Amino acid sequence: VGIAKLEGYELAFRRGYLTILPKEGASVEGLIWSVTDHDESQLDCYEGYPTFYDKETLTVTDADGTPHEIMVYTMNAPYRDQLLPVSSRYNAVVLQGCLDAGISPQQFYDADEKYRKAYKARAAPVPKKHAPER
């Protein structure tokens, strides 16, 4: 249907995939799709609903400022709290999707950079404490 903006959320990598997380002052650009009940049923299977992702109804605005109520998949706890590796293939598909849709890839780059820093910090070895000298 078109490009829209979701206010009050940020794009974030969790458990190797993208999701949206509430964040004051942030926004996420995406596409509004028109889907049939059959399409939604197929998407539910693909997205792992209701175990991996849940569905929420949120309001977005299109380029003309018109509000639209949409359904989005959001990652469930505890999955959204896990930092797992992201595949380069997944990143390439998401980036190409942004470019094909005419969405700025900056939000993807920002989410990727934030994830890499958090993953690296989590994976960093803990320094050993040295025994005091006698």
What are these regions (language model features)?
Residues V1-R134:
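Glycine-aromatic micro-motifs
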